[in-house]
């Protein structure tokens, strides 16, 4: 049975490499490691998609072309289109409630205030799916709005750490794949 990996992020170029697009960055890295083909439009699911064959079965990666807050629409359409069990869905998302670089793989998790996760849970009618959370932290400076922070780019120091974080995330991803 196929597994559906959903990367949360905003689709426009101006949002590339922002904290809120950590899910997109992680998906790109995982697909590259798996030597998968490039993402291509799948308009019927409102997403960019790529299919990677792996030893644990087909892995369908999607990056919704909706904004973060409407991610659920793409997830429901892709779940139905690829006939994926709810428990075979993994959502890659940024997490302001975790320190930068801290990762968490969990099943049946909450939204932690993340509007993309709220949208997915509401659209699926359940939170019985997997999440791989990528800690982006919170602003250190007073007066910085959280929305501006997550829509901001990673600092130079953070960019230097992304490689080792992606290695750890890849290990957690492999662990998740082996569960089914």
UniProtKB/Swiss-Prot annotation:
Enzyme class of the recorded protein, top EC level: hydrolase
Cited PROSITE patterns: PEPT_TRNA_HYDROL_1 (PS01195), PEPT_TRNA_HYDROL_2 (PS01196)
EC number of this enzyme: 3.1.1.29
Annotated site residue numbers, Stabilizes the basic form of H active site to accept a proton: 94
Chain residues that bind tRNA: 15, 67, 69, 115
UniProt KW keywords: Cytoplasm, Hydrolase, RNA-binding, tRNA-binding
Site (Discriminates between blocked and unblocked aminoacyl-tRNA): 10
Hydrolase listed as a keyword: yes
GO BP: protein quality control for misfolded or incompletely synthesized proteins; rescue of stalled ribosome
Subcellular location: Cytoplasm
Chief location category: cytoplasm
GO molecular function: peptidyl-tRNA hydrolase activity; tRNA binding
Reaction(s) this enzyme catalyzes, per UniProt: an N-acyl-L-alpha-aminoacyl-tRNA + H2O = an N-acyl-L-amino acid + a tRNA + H(+)
Keyword NAD: no
Active site, per annotation: 20 (proton acceptor)
Subunit structure: Monomer.
Physiological role: Hydrolyzes ribosome-free peptidyl-tRNAs (with 1 or more amino acids incorporated), which drop off the ribosome during protein synthesis, or as a result of ribosome stalling. Catalyzes the release of premature peptidyl moieties from peptidyl-tRNA molecules trapped in stalled 50S ribosomal subunits, and thus maintains levels of free tRNAs and 50S ribosomes.
Family: Belongs to the PTH family.
Name of this chain's protein: Peptidyl-tRNA hydrolase
Designated gene of the protein: pth
């Amino acid at each position: 049975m196929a597994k559906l990996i959903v990367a949360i992020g905003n689709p426009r170029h101006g949002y590339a490499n922002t904290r809120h697009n950590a899910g997109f960055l992680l998906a790109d890295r995982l697909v590259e490691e798996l030597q998968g083909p490039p993402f291509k439009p799948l308009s019927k699911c409102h997403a960019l998609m790529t299919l990677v064959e792996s030893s644990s079965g087909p892995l369908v990666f999607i990056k919704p072309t909706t904004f973060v807050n409407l991610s659920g629409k793409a997830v429901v359409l892709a779940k139905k289109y690829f006939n994926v069990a709810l428990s075979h869905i993994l959502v890659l998302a940024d997490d302001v409630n975790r320190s930068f670089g801290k990762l968490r793989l969990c099943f049946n998790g909450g939204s932690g205030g993340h509007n993309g996760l709220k949208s997915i849970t509401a659209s699926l009618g359940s939170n019985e799916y997997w999440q791989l959370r990528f800690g982006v932290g919170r602003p250190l400076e007073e007066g910085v709005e959280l929305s501006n922070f997550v829509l901001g780019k990673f600092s130079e120091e953070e960019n230097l750490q992304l490689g080792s974080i992606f290695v750890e995330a890849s290990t957690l991803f492999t662990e998740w794949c082996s569960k089914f």
